């Protein structure tokens, strides 16, 4: 009995934090990291949130314009291009939906200055997927606020 309890404790300690932690809190942290990357004009820091395989669905007006499915290096390049002339002035995660077992959705609000220099408030719907112990960005859809 004692060995089985010890084995369970050992296995639990080896689980990645995102498996052992609160899924909604992990998705919130991932969504906050997206905002921090954009506000700091460091799209390279998004790399750790992008999937190893597959594409990211983007539907962006002010932060783009971009609409389609993009490979992770393209996502990074698109945001680098936007941040060369635009900016994200403020960013706030307002809510996370559901328990976030394998997929999660976060809603954020941002104050941006687009490529033409026009300020705007936008809503962002970010979708995440749990992939090999980490939450990766699978989609970002912009809405008018």
Regions found by a protein language model. Give the residues of each.
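Short, low-complexity N-terminal intrinsically disordered segments enriched in polar/charged residues
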Residues: 16-44, 48
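Short beta-strand edge/turn micro-motifs at domain boundaries
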Residues: 117-145
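Bacterial N-terminal signal peptides
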Residues: 7-14
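Surface-exposed patches in mature extracellular/periplasmic domains of secreted proteins
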Residues: 42-49, 89-95
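Surface-exposed, charged secondary-structure patches
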Residues: 70-116
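A short, structured loop/turn motif at beta-sheet edges
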Residues: 40, 98-104, 129-134
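Positively charged n-region of N-terminal signal peptides that target proteins for export
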Residues: 1-4
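Short, solvent-exposed secondary-structure junction/capping segments
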Residues: 36, 50-65
């Amino acid at each position: 009995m004692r060995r089985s309890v010890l084995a369970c404790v050992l296995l639990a300690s080896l689980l990645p934090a995102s498996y052992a932690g609160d899924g909604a809190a992990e998705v919130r942290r991932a969504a906050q990291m997206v905002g921090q990357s954009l506000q700091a004009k460091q799209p390279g820091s998004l790399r750790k949130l992008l999937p190893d395989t597959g594409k990211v669905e983007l539907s962006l007006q002010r932060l783009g314009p971009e609409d389609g499915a993009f490979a992770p290096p393209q996502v990074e390049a698109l945001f680098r291009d936007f941040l060369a002339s635009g900016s994200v002035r403020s960013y706030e995660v307002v809510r996370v939906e559901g328990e976030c077992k394998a997929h999660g959705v976060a809603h954020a609000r941002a104050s941006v200055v687009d490529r033409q220099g026009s300020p705007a408030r936008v809503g962002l719907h970010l979708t995440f997927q749990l992939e090999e112990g980490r939450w990766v960005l699978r989609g970002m859809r912009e809405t008018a606020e």
